Amino acid sequence: MAKQVILAVAGAGKTYHVCHMIDKDKKNLILAFTHENIHNILNELMDAHGSIPELTSVMTFDSFVYRYLILPYESTIGEFFGYPELISSGITTVDPPKQRIKGRNGEPIANPYYHSKNEFEHYINRKKQYYCATLSELVLYIKKGRDSLIKRAAAAINMFYDHVLIDEFQDFREYDYELIISMAKQINNMVLVGDYYQHSVSATNNSGKPFQNKEGEVGYDAFCHEIEKQGFSIDQCTLMGSRRCSKNICSYVSRKLGISIEGNNKNEGDIIWVDETSIAAIIQNSNIIKLVYNNANKYPFRALNWSYSKGDTFSQTCVILTEQLEKIDDPAFSIKKIKPTTVNKLYVAMTRSKGNVYLIKASVLKKYLEQ
């Protein structure tokens, strides 16, 4: 069985690679985390092949789990929980009741509406709709002796598809990640493509396995070791060059953030520090997108949060640094003192531009806004 993880860098063309590596005459299943990812994949497939290959299916991971791992085995699921006549009514994106809620004084208390994982109500609401948030957890939970939903479903998937490809794998956490690993042990050919350093960037789904454990953050080398333990080969070469960022930008990111990324020869761009004499021109230039750590809507100019810029490409960007990062250009500055999640968000922000990246210190911006 062929199982591979392709580790990429920002702007390397992950989706481009996925869509161009497939054999359109083979039966391919391409999965991604968000509908935006799916939209990008469909557009890339059109560019690569002129149309969506007839034998290629594209869907979100949640849709895949529901359609291939739950619906065909609903009678088995119903019997497992004592509901042999179960007929469900789709899925809901509303989250199930949490185990603990805040009391009158703000203290955590038990939620009377919470159901444990051995109860069917943990996975389905009163309208017989499956909770989207617990789909993978449900599939992992259903076992009878050595038999499991995963084994049965994987056998069917191997019949339907020659290759399974998962784009932006760094977006998957906890039960979704566990399900992917469990399926990989049964599915004949699976390829995962993603950027380790773009994990924990989104506002949601940013904790837990495989990037966090009881000891805290799982580093790059430890992550690679864990993936190899699961039977995957790792390709750290194919997508190590950014098609977006210049050599100068990538060199600075590598040197200051400790993230290995190679630039291209086509685009030209530099890191440019903005001081009190030049800040007005940069802030007032609407063609230069401003990227801020958070609360973009509170700034008196059009801005975008670092994390929300993930996946975007701009001609030029202006990254406004936090106080913690003001001295990043100093030789004595150590990125190791900064939280990994913050480093990842800064990495995303600094790799959005095809041209120049302007850097503004928080103190310089504060003075400008107080004028």
Predicted regions and their residues:
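The feature marks helicase ATPase cores and/or their adjacent C-terminal helical subdomains
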Residues: M1-Q371
